């Protein structure tokens, strides 16, 4: 069971915080869900060059968006675009928008995937990429990186993965992060999956 289901979904009720914090009646649920998806899509489209750790969306009388970033320098890059972004969101949803930035220095699975994608686009060796990222995360209890597809232009698609520490997929009480994404190369699409076993008090 633990190997088939998404690890975040498996632990959602126990020790994982959901990043869409809003409640509504059944008749309005579809509208709020569309708003949530639309906001995340606009954020990804506008801040494509920024490595966002998490996006928290809180909808009530006002719309509150918390963006978690790892580097203060990233905030300086997007500072000039914030007014346009807030205006765009408030115009679509017709709500007052509060935008908060939270500087989160704890590395998570999405940050690792972001680094892996950048190194793949720079045409580094797949085995070298995985080895370097695992060494960076050796302070965690466990980390697993898997890259699949036509690696380095080979004719037959394959998987390359490596693990440091342990990844307890079946134990719900442990703080386990998971992230998957895709990147387009000249040989086709590569799939990237990250499992990260962190300390329970880390976000």
From Swiss-Prot:
InterPro entries: KH_sf_prok-type (IPR009019), Ribosomal_S3_C_sf (IPR036419), Ribosomal_uS3_bac-typ (IPR005704), Ribosomal_uS3_C (IPR001351), Ribosomal_uS3_CS (IPR018280). Gene3D superfamilies: Ribosomal protein S3, C-terminal domain (3.30.1140.32). GO terms for biological process: translation. GO terms for cellular component: cytosolic small ribosomal subunit. Residues 39-113 form the KH type-2 domain. The keyword Heme does not apply. Pfam families: Ribosomal_S3_C. GO terms for molecular function: mRNA binding; rRNA binding; structural constituent of ribosome. Keywords: Ribonucleoprotein, Ribosomal protein, RNA-binding, rRNA-binding. It comes from the Bacteria. Part of the 30S ribosomal subunit. Forms a tight complex with proteins S10 and S14. NCBIfam families: rpsC_bact. Binds the lower part of the 30S subunit head. Binds mRNA in the 70S ribosome, positioning it for translation. Belongs to the universal ribosomal protein uS3 family. This is Small ribosomal subunit protein uS3. It comes from Carsonella ruddii. The gene is rpsC.
